[in-house]
């Protein structure tokens, strides 16, 4: 039985990884050891958020009902050097063929989840904070210093499903694509006599004997679509992964256009958008043959269209005339061009990650920010995020790092003055002439 399905091909979701657990500042009870000696354990890692290509899904419809995915926070460290529990990871299923985009530090990155089982580490869980057991020194035997957990990553993801249909129906608006799909499958697309009735693809499963294939009624195309006019790119991006195109032409010219010009214009738009699309195998269906105007145009179309006779069909989607030979030819061409096999990913294969450029974690920048100064750098901002700014020992640690890393020197070179505000991450420090900072 032929079947149809709704199609939901774009979605925006938010993924938030878990925060790392806090390190513990605890002490064991032992005679002659100051405060019993530190024994605070480390916090656990926050849970990651993964996207996984799941062949059980063929649209992004499930994101209409849930758009935010949050992983578990890591557990806090405990006494006796007990390590906090790692937060549970979250796996978000998407259909194979989903393209994922995220903007990180002002740059947009793209990952393609094409193969079943492929995973993307979409949001990384925060590191657990170190317990006070790590901060003993010869001069500080009983530190109360412990780190906070690192915040988990939070990103907004743009998802786009590049359709995996076998056959795409292309043509001008109102050429009869939706009517044809409703005839050859159980899909029930919206059909009406005005342009852009189809705003999103409709999928239908077609059976020819024992052979089954997926046909997509793709939004209608107009002149300038390659530049985004009309539904433009929303039309063209859907056909990139189809193996075969059925090019439907209104042979009667009901909308006042000439059918042979329609044929040329569609192929021009395909070529301008992506040259290889114009080379993709097509069969041409001259539709609306039940109308007298179509019958008058057929001899001209047969003469003018550069289409082999075996790939040119006269049909009427309204009366179903000529449909069967068309489908037989489509099935034959698909058998001759089987889809590439996408083997499932080995479960032990590491997940994909955002293709971020290498970063020097020790690097930093100092710049004016209004009347204040802003310090940016991976390592120093992480230190601020994982420090309890109400602890004197944490502030002392920050001061030592600012001095040792050269940030203090860079601030003085930038012209910092007594009383100026210095912002690092969430912290606002005030410069004094001795080179020290205070909250």
Curated annotation (Swiss-Prot):
Main location per the UniProt record: cytoplasm
Gene Ontology BP, a term: ribosome biogenesis
Region described as Disordered: 337-359
Annotated ranges, domain OCT: 356-433
Annotated Obg domain residues: 5-164
Enzyme Commission (EC) number: 3.6.5.-
One protein family per Pfam: GTP1_OBG
InterPro entries assigned to the protein according to its UniProt record, in alphabetical order: G_OBG, GTP-bd, GTP-bd_Obg/CgtA, GTP-bd_prot_GTP1/OBG_C_sf, GTP1-OBG_CS, GTP1_OBG_dom, GTP1_OBG_dom_sf, OBG_GTPase
Binding-site residues, Mg(2+): 178, 198
Superkingdom in the source lineage: Bacteria
CDD domains: Obg
Record has Kinase as a keyword: no
GO cellular component terms given for this protein: cytoplasm
Names of required cofactors: Mg(2+)
Gene3D superfamilies, sorted: GTP-binding protein OBG, C-terminal domain, GTP1/OBG domain, P-loop containing nucleotide triphosphate hydrolases
Keywords, comma-separated and alphabetical: Cytoplasm, GTP-binding, Hydrolase, Magnesium, Metal-binding, Nucleotide-binding
GO terms, molecular function: GTP binding; GTPase activity; magnesium ion binding
Compartment list: Cytoplasm
Residue ranges constituting the OBG-type G domain according to the UniProt record: 165-335
Binding-site positions, GTP: 171-178, 196-200, 217-220, 287-290, 316-318
PANTHER family linked: DEVELOPMENTALLY REGULATED GTP-BINDING PROTEIN-RELATED (PTHR11702), MITOCHONDRIAL RIBOSOME-ASSOCIATED GTPASE 2 (PTHR11702:SF31)
Function in brief: An essential GTPase which binds GTP, GDP and possibly (p)ppGpp with moderate affinity, with high nucleotide exchange rates and a fairly low GTP hydrolysis rate. Plays a role in control of the cell cycle, stress response, ribosome biogenesis and in those bacteria that undergo differentiation, in morphogenesis control.
UniProt cross-references to HAMAP family, sorted A to Z: GTPase_Obg
Protein name: GTPase Obg
Species whose genome carries this gene: Chloroflexus aggregans (strain MD-66 / DSM 9485)
Chain's gene name: obg
